[in-house]
Every structure is written in C-alpha cells, then in structure tokens.
C-alpha cells in the first residue's frame, strides 16, 4: 500500500505499507521495480493521479489502473448525472495521451455502487 507520509491509518499485519510524499520525484523512487499500480485515490484527489502516472512512466511501470471503479465515465450522459466523474474522464484522456510512452492502462467500469445508498 502506497500512502502519504501524513496518513496515520493502521493497516493489518502483513500488509507492506510505504509512506511517502506524493511529489513526483519521491513517487518515482518508490515505484521503481513495480509492474503495475492500482490507484484507489478518492474523489478529492482524482487529478493527483496525473503525478502518479508521470512518476510511473519515469519509473518504468508497465500498467496503471486508475481510480475508475464506477460506471463508464467516458459517457456524457453519466457525467451529466454525476458531475464528480468529470475529473475521471480527464484522467482517462491523460492515460490515452501517455500510451506512446509504453505505459498500458485498464479502466474498470463495475457499474453503480449502491451499498452506501439508504
């Protein structure tokens, strides 16, 4: 698990936790030797994935899975209903731009999440 240096969350025993700055140079160092990244950045940090993507490219990471665990955020009608998905579209477009670097990516559209709806 890659998390910010300031994060005080206690993780389960056996989980490798790397606490670091989310600045590009710090991320490049900790991402070296990794094959893939699965981003679980929350809504307030979607745009910060660009720094993570750039660091992954510099570190030679082969695959990036963005924080895209929802419906098809490339759909205009979905983004009209859920405006918070607009930054997710921007990240997918950014990944498309970066394909020429050799970084591959997968966006996971799992459908709407209703567990939190009461």
What does each model-found stretch correspond to?
Residues 41, 68, 109:
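Glycine-rich, histidine-containing beta strand-loop boundary motifs that form or position
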Residues 55-71:
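ADP-ribose/adenylate-binding Rossmann-like module
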Residues 2-15, 24-25, 46-47, 59, ...:
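Oxidoreductase cofactor-interface core, primarily capturing Rossmann-like NAD(P)-dependent enzymes
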């Amino acid at each position: 698990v890659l998390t910010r240096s300031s994060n005080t969350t206690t993780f389960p025993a056996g989980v490798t936790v790397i606490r670091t700055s989310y600045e590009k140079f710090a991320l490049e160092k900790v991402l070296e030797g990794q094959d893939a990244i699965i981003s679980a950045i929350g809504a307030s940090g979607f745009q910060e994935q660009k720094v993570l993507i750039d660091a992954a490219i510099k570190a030679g990471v082969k695959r990036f899975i963005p924080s895209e665990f929802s419906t098809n955020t490339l759909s205009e009608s979905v983004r009209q209903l859920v405006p918070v998905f607009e930054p997710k579209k921007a990240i997918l477009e950014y990944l498309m731009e970066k394909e020429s670097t050799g970084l591959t990516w997968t966006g996971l559209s799992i459908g709407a999440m209703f567990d939190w709806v009461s």
